[in-house]
C-alpha cells in the first residue's frame, strides 16, 4: 500500500503505454498484468534504454543480473526478469553477448516443472546458437 500511494497505478500505466505496447489496457493495476511477446520485447527495449541512459541504470542492471532463476540460460551475462503466477510462467532477458540480443519466453505453464525448465533452457540455448554468438 505504501508503494502504491507513492507511485499510483495510473502513472505507471501512462509511463508503460509510452513504450508502444500493443495492449496497454492489459496493464491493469501494475501487477499480475497480461503480456504478449511483442509487449515483453517493448518492456525489454525500455529496460535496455533505461540501463544505458539513466543515472540509476547501472543499479538496475546489477539487480537484474543477480536474478538466479534457472529458466533462460546463456553463456553470457544477462539482465533478466521472470514472472510466475497462476497460468503464466515467463522469463525475459537482455543477453550481453558479443552480438547482444533480447529474448522473451512466455508460456501458459504455471508449475515450473523440470520439463518446463528444460523447455526454457533448450529454447534459450538454440537462440544463442543461431544468434551467431557461439
Please give the residue ranges for each predicted region.
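Penicillin-recognizing serine hydrolase domain
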Residues: 1-134
